[in-house]
């Protein structure tokens, strides 16, 4: 028997407990600006830490390979129903353990090794699972990539021409570092014109889409994949939305195709997050995410920094650092010393190596969860610029860190 009072982390494993406490403090003390990170609610975390972690449930609700699944069936069905309602989807699979596995599930369902796929170039803002050479998608399939035009928007004309020429079996839309709105309807029409499947990976934009502040790809795509964290503010995991005609193929692709027993405690966290996302408060939050990102971009531009594409229409932006004579790697480290957490990121046609880069990626979801609004977004933009204007001055870094501390104390993550 486990006596709850005796089996606490601090008693069983002081080393892990100490690391968790230190990470808790880091999250409170630093302003999180990594666009793919966010803070989940205590309710989501409680679901993930529940006894559902003990239950094996291979299969799907009402059709399991194990007994005793009557309650996890309820949880999974709630997650399915809620995510369908959230995005207006005909069918959904909530079992993928990650966004990458959600993408892999679609590939396994409709492609064979050697088929041609077409996705956005990683070097111009795409994602590694859309055909990067070292990724499974790049090793198993023939990959053709589309990119940006001179205005650093997606070159839709070139995309259409390439699709007509190469006739891919699957066209992929979605990005990991692209700030503008994606015309899913237009790409969907291109796919339809050549008889290709159309998949949208909306992982980075899902929260905005759920709230109606970014275009919804669901009406235009055969498959829509997403993570459940990032802007959606749920647990780390994945989901596939699809047309009803593809539901059987996708379900078979996930189980038994690429996964075994689903993580029921994580699916519970997904269900809770989807319920949160259906509220008016979540819509207001996403509206603020977009407002904060716009102010952040405007502030950085006013301070002499170049934003790739010239603006943001979402939650994310790429900052070109070449004019400051500092690499993304160095900027990430120095901003981190000031308690401003960003990630280095390649910019289009980046001359630096992928682990060095000429840019940083900055996003507003996590700081908005803290309660930051336009005033705080402007302060954060100026603090970033203050660091980058004088990155090797220890006194400057310390002064910025003090201002960050004042902000984080006013806006705790978990009150």
Curated annotation (Swiss-Prot):
Gene3D superfamilies: Aspartate Aminotransferase, domain 1, Type I PLP-dependent aspartate aminotransferase-like (Major domain). CDD domains: SHMT (cd00378). One of its GO terms (cellular component) is cytosol. Belongs to the SHMT family. Its cofactor is pyridoxal 5'-phosphate. This is Serine hydroxymethyltransferase. Its EC number is 2.1.2.1. It is found in: Cytoplasm. One of its GO terms (biological process) is glycine biosynthetic process from serine. Catalyzes the reversible interconversion of serine and glycine with tetrahydrofolate (THF) serving as the one-carbon carrier. This reaction serves as the major source of one-carbon groups required for the biosynthesis of purines, thymidylate, methionine, and other important biomolecules. Also exhibits THF-independent aldolase activity toward beta-hydroxyamino acids, producing glycine and aldehydes, via a retro-aldol mechanism. GO terms for molecular function: glycine hydroxymethyltransferase activity; pyridoxal phosphate binding. Pfam families: SHMT.
């Amino acid at each position: 028997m486990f006596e709850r009072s005796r089996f606490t982390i601090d008693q069983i494993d002081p080393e892990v407990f100490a690391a968790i406490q230190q990470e808790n403090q880091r999250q409170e003390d630093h302003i999180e600006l990594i666009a793919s990170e966010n803070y989940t609610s205590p309710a989501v975390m409680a679901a993930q830490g529940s006894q559902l972690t003990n239950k094996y449930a291979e299969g799907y609700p009402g059709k399991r390979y194990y007994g005793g699944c009557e309650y996890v069936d309820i949880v999974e069905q709630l997650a399915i129903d809620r995510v369908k309602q959230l995005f207006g989807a005909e069918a959904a699979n909530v079992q993928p353990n990650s966004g990458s596995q959600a993408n892999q599930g679609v590939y396994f369902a409709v492609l064979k090794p050697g088929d041609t796929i077409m996705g956005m170039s990683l070097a111009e803002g795409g994602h590694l699972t859309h055909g990067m050479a070292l990724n499974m998608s790049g090793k198993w399939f023939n990959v053709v990539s589309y990119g940006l035009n001179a205005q650093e928007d997606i070159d839709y004309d070139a995309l259409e021409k390439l699709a007509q020429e190469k006739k891919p079996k699957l066209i992929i839309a979605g990005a990991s570092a692209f700030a503008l709105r994606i015309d899913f309807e237009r790409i969907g029409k291109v796919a339809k014109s050549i008889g290709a499947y159309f998949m949208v990976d909306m992982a980075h934009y899902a929260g905005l889409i759920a709230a109606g502040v970014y275009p919804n790809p669901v009406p235009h795509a055969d498959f829509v994949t997403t993570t459940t964290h990032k802007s959606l503010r749920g647990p780390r995991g994945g989901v596939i939305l699809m047309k009803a005609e593809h539901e059987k193929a996708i379900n078979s692709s996930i189980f038994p195709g690429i996964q075994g027993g689903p993580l029921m405690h994580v699916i519970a966290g997904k269900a809770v997050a989807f319920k949160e996302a259906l509220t008016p408060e979540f819509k207001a939050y996403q509206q603020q995410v977009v407002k904060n990102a716009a102010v952040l971009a405007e502030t950085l531009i006013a301070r002499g920094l170049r934003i790739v594409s010239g603006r943001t229409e979402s939650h994310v932006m790429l900052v070109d650092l070449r004019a400051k004579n500092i690499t993304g790697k160095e900027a990430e480290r120095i901003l981190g010393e000031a308690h401003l957490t960003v990630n280095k990121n390649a910019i289009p046609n980046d001359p630096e190596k992928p682990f060095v880069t000429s840019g940083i990626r900055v996003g507003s979801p996590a700081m908005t969860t803290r309660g930051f609004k336009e005033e705080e977004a402007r302060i954060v933009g100026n603090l970033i610029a203050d660091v980058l204007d004088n990155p090797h001055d220890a006194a400057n870094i310390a002064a910025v860190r003090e201002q960050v501390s004042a902000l984080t104390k006013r806006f705790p993550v978990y009150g």
